[in-house]
């Protein structure tokens, strides 16, 4: 017969292995320290941009914040293919939001028909 210690050792190894195979584990790509450093870099980039806007406003007069700046990049994204947005609802959610959805559809359909 197999000793109790061997059975206990196999159980201790087998149980976590089974749990690990059944769960969807999240493996972080970045460590907590790396995330903090990246956030700090983003903050410093934001401060540099605001500083450059402030310096320009001193040289050229007040700068309108809504006015695009060359450094920020004036790229406009244009869709080349039709975009379809979908939503899944169960019957209870549909009953709950039916009036709001009908209102949105009635607003959107005349706009598309006019085009």
From Swiss-Prot:
Coiled-coil annotated residue ranges, if any: none
PANTHER family assigned to the protein according to its UniProt record, in alphabetical order: MOTILIN, PROMOTILIN
List localization entries.
Answer: Secreted
Keyword Secreted attributed: yes
Q: Where is the secretion signal located? A: 1-25
Described function: Plays an important role in the regulation of interdigestive gastrointestinal motility and indirectly causes rhythmic contraction of duodenal and colonic smooth muscle.
Q: Name one GO molecular function term.
A: hormone activity
* Keywords from the named record: Cleavage on pair of basic residues, Hormone, Secreted, Signal
Q: What is its main location?
A: secreted
Q: Which family does it belong to?
A: Belongs to the motilin family.
Q: Which GO terms describe its cellular component?
A: extracellular region
For the keyword Mitochondrion, the answer is no
Q: Which protein, by its recorded name, is this?
A: Promotilin
Cross-referenced Pfam families: Motilin_assoc, Motilin_ghrelin
Residue numbers spanned by region Disordered:
40-74
């Amino acid at each position: 017969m197999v000793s109790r210690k061997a059975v206990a050792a196999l159980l201790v190894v087998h149980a976590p292995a089974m749990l690990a195979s059944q769960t969807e584990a999240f493996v972080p790509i970045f460590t907590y320290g790396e995330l903090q450093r990246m956030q700090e870099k983003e903050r410093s980039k934001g401060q540099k941009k605001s500083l450059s806007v402030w310096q320009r406003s001193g040289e050229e007069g007040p700068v309108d914040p809504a006015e695009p700046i060359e450094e920020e990049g004036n790229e406009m994204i244009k869709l080349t293919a039709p975009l379809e947005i979908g939503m899944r609802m169960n019957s209870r959610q549909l009953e709950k939001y039916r009036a709001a959805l009908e209102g949105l559809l009635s607003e959107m359909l005349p706009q598309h028909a006019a085009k």
